[in-house]
Amino acid sequence: SLRLMLRDPLAFVWRYALGWRAVPEDDQPLTLDARSYGELVHELLKRTVDALEPVPGYARASREEIEAALATSTETVRTHWPLKRSAPPALLWKHTLAAAAQLALKALTLDETFQPGTRSWTELAFSQAGDGAMAHDLPWRPDSLVTIPGTQVRIRGNIDRLDLTGDRRGVRVSDYKTGVEPRRAEEIVLGRGAELQRVIYSVAASQLLP
């Protein structure tokens, strides 16, 4: 840091006074890998649901309202994603984003309508140390501990989406997946561990909601 201050005072101010960092420049991909694509879809889902809450409310929103919120979220992600992450060239990025938006719309309109007064939250954390200050307007504190029933083993995570009825008697947890839909998906209970995540989500909801 002293060497930088002597050689380039302006760069020293940028880095240590303003906290600026250069964005890593990766090779521009032609496509997003599976993980990045999943994160892209999750980002669209989160922004859309958050935009609909608390008014009119995701669970009460019409398809037109969902589509409008998704369109706004898609445009925001279109401009912000390439500033922080690697993205394909412009034309391919446009098609990638359109495909991700279609997948997000399917996920957002798949579930049946819940009761009036239902609230929805996305990326809802549990057992996350140090997140207690972020508990405003959430159904529980993000640092609230969750354990496997009958043990002292703690589990933590983030619920993709939680819908809670106004009387707090009805709860729905959603775990978004962007991979290929398995055969006879309606018959899968634990799916050799692949569905275990939803079980953990349910345990968290049952312990943290009074």
Residue spans for each PLM region:
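Glycine- and acidic
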Residues: S1, G19-T31, L52-A61, W81-K94, ...
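Short, intrinsically disordered, charge-balanced linker/junction segments flanking boundaries
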Residues: S1, Q207-P210
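Non-catalytic protein-protein interaction segments used by genome-maintenance enzymes to assemble
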Residues: L124-L208
